[in-house]
Amino acid sequence: MRTPTCLCLLLICMLISCTPTQEKHEIDYTSYVNPFIGTDFTGNTYPGAQAPFGMVQLSPDNGLPGWDRISGYFYPDSTIAGFSHTHLSGTGAGDLYDISFMPVTLPYKEAKAPLGIHSKFSHDDESAYAGYYQVRLTDYNINVELTATERCGIQRYTFPEAQSAIFLNLKKAMNWDFTNDSHIEVIDSVTIQGYRFSNGWARDQHIYFRTRFSKPFEKIELDTMAIVKENKRIGTATIARFDFNTQEGEQILVSTAISGVSMEGAAKNLQAEVPENNFDKYLAATKANWNRQLGKIEVKSDNEDDKVNFYTAIYHSMIAPTIYSDVDGAYYGPDKKVHQADGWVNYSTFSLWDTYRAAHPLFTYTEPERVNDMVKSFIAFYEQNGRLPVWNFYGSETDMMIGYHAVPVIADAYLKGIGDFDAEKALAACVATANLDNYRGIGLYKKLGYIPYNVTDSYNAENWSLSKTLEYAFDDYCIAEMAQKMGKKDIADEFYKRSQNYKNVYNPATSFMQPRDDKGVFIKDFKADDYTPHICESNGWQYFWSVQHDVDGLVNLVGGKNRFAEKLDSMFTYHPSEDDELPLFSTGMIGQYAHGNEPSHHVIYLFNSIGFNDRTQYYVAKVMNELYKNEPAGLCGNEDCGQMSAWYVFSAMGFYPVNPVSGRYEIGTPLFPEIKLHLANGKTFTVLAPNVNLSLIHISEPTRRSYI
């Protein structure tokens, strides 16, 4: 590696008050948001309208299933078959697409299922920014505009002169989603309400809605059909058609509130958030809301693409988790009962295996009040379900992925002194979840100090034994840190001991973490670059480094700093062969490093721990400049509910939380000459790197340490 030329980096923390420019939003940050980033390749994002952390994600659906269309939208497609109110951002499993509307002129185009009623469209007639989406439906010459409040979606259709109709399809389902039952009832000539119940990734999902049209419909047709499963009727599939006679340029607004609780809850949400037919008013309010959020981090740069990538990353990091309680505080719990969040907001859509790494640590600085409510949501979930969430949304635990990663989110919040959540209840929930002997090998983990690959339980069908051992060890460390701070020495000692279990799957003969059976024998014919059922979405190279809580211990385990440096270098230089068939999640590859999936995200920063800071800086800059682009295919892997973007936000600011609960941030290399992080307590953290550019990425020491 060449001898680095160094730039000067200054880290400044100063106390200031909120400035007038922050309140006036003289900079329109939404203009730097490109919601189409991630809608191509493997990003799995959607371009539609949403308020920050909003319950409603109002976005177009292409109408076709498939892994590329998990978000409902895939940039290479050329059809739109509806605009639905719920979506998942960047996940690897598909669900939701609830309450789907489609405007048409008569006669309309209908294809065989699954596409159904649809229209062609062109990207030349499509635009979007934070809180807004627009497209012209080519086949009907209808212009569609979308915006959203937290719990409501507002659509504005501009029609030609024609006999027109608006379809509401509660039968439509894609990917893992399946309609169980649905219902529509007419309140008056402009108001309807109903529900859609479904099964899929989210089990027994309930979505209720209330919709108001700005113009009375002339006629309504209901198409209902029985839903039959195993020769038994389980519900009704409903499609409604609302007819209108429209003039050239006439606009009809469709305002819809949703609720997980009841039609009455949806009606309250609509009345509270969208009481009138005024698209521009609510668009302006949501745009202002996004500007407040995006303006929490200011950057100065002459590179427009870098600013778009950065503010789009902040935007994507604030898509999830999502608000789940109604305006009156009611929400539907995992116990299938209605509960009340009094004085706080209940949140859902927690992709914790992904987001505990960077997204939630970022929230502790940009969203401390929401973090408090998220922890309260975890505690409530535990009280209603008997364990903390793993991957939950819309009142359902999916049990997707591994670990008990609500724990680091809770511990980080507690150790930073955030909020007024009940720490005693929170710690009790963490300890109880970590001691569920019949859940995903935890009992064997406690008994043997690792999870054997040859023993399964009812929750362990996917195996992933090696990865679970490493993830549990990290989560146990987080419990220990929280207990230690609370003065609970017995709990702390127990879980500090458990946090060392990562050493039990290290094989000195191969110098890799390696699966073991219940007799303690390491699996035979182990190849670190193989993708096997024992390692979660990764290979032995990628998961080896998942010891974020004890990097010094890992260094010693492999034989010291020199050996560690050799192994870490090999991670980035041992490239897959051209004949290797890599799985979907192995993308953004640099050697064996896979930036497209989360287990690799902290690895670049491990060079700091052995004094090779320049290598951290080199690879951080390489990833930021080569794997994040201002284009639809601009993400190299699943967005994963904000984690992919949160990595970029932290790294662009010049630091990253390798161990998310340590309060320690490894210094990388900033992307911008000046960055200001405005904190909720009125302080501003400023990073200055006045000479930074693509060829000048290495920094002189800002402190005597490689971290802050």
Predicted regions mapped to residue ranges:
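Positively charged n-region of N-terminal signal peptides that target proteins for export
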Residues: M1-T5
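Sec-dependent N-terminal signal peptides
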Residues: C6-L10
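C-terminal motif of bacterial Sec signal peptides marking the signal peptidase cleavage site
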Residues: L15-S17
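Accessory carbohydrate-recognition regions in carbohydrate-active enzymes
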Residues: E23-H360, T364-P408, Y414-L470, C478-N504, ...
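ATP-dependent phospho-/nucleotidyl transfer catalytic cores
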Residues: D475
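Single conserved hydrophobic/aromatic residue that forms the stacking wall/gate
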Residues: I697-E701, R705-I708
